[in-house]
Amino acid sequence: MRVLFYVSILVIIASVHTQLISVHVIFRHGARAPVLNVTSEEAKSYFYRGLGQLTDEGFEQARLMGKVLRDRYVNSFVDARMLSSQLLFRSSPVERCLMTLQTVGNTMFPNATPPVQTVAKPDDFLLVPKLDCDFQLGEWDNYFNLTESDKKMARKNPWFVSDKALRKAVTKTDFLQDRGGENLPALILEKEAGLAVPSWFNEGAYKESLHVFYSALAVMSSVGEYKSSKGIRIKSGLLMEKVFNDIQEKVRCHEKKEVSNIKCDIHKLQVFSSHDLLILPILETLGIREEVLGKDMPPEFMSTIIIETMIVDNSPVVKVLFRKNPREITLRDVTGFVKNCPPGQPLCPVQRFTSCCNEFITSDPKSECYAETTVEKQSEWVMTPLSWIIVAIAILLLIALILMTYFVIRYKNRSIVNIKKLSLEN
């Protein structure tokens, strides 16, 4: 009887037809050097590629990510020969992101590395979070009561505000009370790399510094206590709209495929390499930030969000996976925690998933970010050389018209006078 029960279970499982139709992978770059400065000669030697550059550990993390993706998708989902039509590899133009994605791609397809696409930083609203939007200064002013001098500094360098958030967070700590002026982001990376750090930067100070560093990121990414729907839209809204549209398009394609036998393989695996300032608002958008990162914690290097779309018994559904630690090879299923999805369930209907977060998506972040500037530019009158020529011609024509009118009136008046004289003489 028990054998019959297990056999029936296996029959039911086997009868469920599942087809993976699209995958979106979004990750933070691998381990890097501090961006602004290091705190010792030892650190300077260790981070030999320079500030902000990928480290040897970062390359290893990228290779492991490539292995995870290769084992999960290459052969079983995409062609192992690397057909570029099936893939979209897109990176932020920042070198550490480009190198991370290139390494991931090379590990997935060792015989033919996928082409990596990118866009210049000022024009990239997909993977480069914008920090210079007009409205953000107003939001920051509400948080920190900025002086006019502060506002000038923030316009010149938005990270000035991040430092304010960091110093504010330091005042709430136990170990870091008098350390607001220290280079905490660099010390975090140096300690994680196993380098010597000051004695005061013990384990307690290190753990507190992670929360402090999160606060510095939160204000720039518009999440947590600094949550702003508009701020999130500007940073991750275009990418999330693309993901939702891609999913819906793939579902429509496969519905048509049933009757017309069309191909639906174009860009069915998309991989994006970006920054912590993009990962945070995406997690906030999906409603899973605290669940996957912990309370007030920053994303680790190579933090990865994977969205799989599949057809299960003719129903389009989504599975959301997360990889927190750069050394992990397992993926955590977090579908049941995603906003608008059935709680605790391993699959989420596509319709519910793609309608989860309308307040956080946008098709035109540029106009939302620079709305006032755009209006001002449109209303400005710019005098080009051609404009001056046209104005000069118009003035000459006006003068000529006035003179012609004057002479016509004068001639007409003379004619009337002559007629009157003739009438009197006759």
Curated annotation (Swiss-Prot):
Reaction catalysed by this enzyme:
a phosphate monoester + H2O = an alcohol + phosphate
- What's its EC? 3.1.3.2
Please indicate the ranges of residues that lie on the Cytoplasmic side: 410-426
Matching SUPFAM superfamilies, A to Z?
Answer: Phosphoglycerate mutase-like
Extract the GO molecular function terms from the UniProt entry.
Answer: acid phosphatase activity; phosphatase activity
| Coiled-coil features, chain-numbered ranges | none
Catalytic residues, per the record, are H29, D276
* Subcellular compartments: Membrane
Q: How does it sit in the membrane?
A: Single-pass type I membrane protein
Q: From the UniProt annotation, give the residues forming the signal peptide.
A: 1-18
Q: Which family does it belong to?
A: Belongs to the histidine acid phosphatase family.
What protein name is recorded for this chain? Putative acid phosphatase 1
Tell me the organism.
Caenorhabditis elegans
Q: Name the gene behind this protein.
A: acp-1
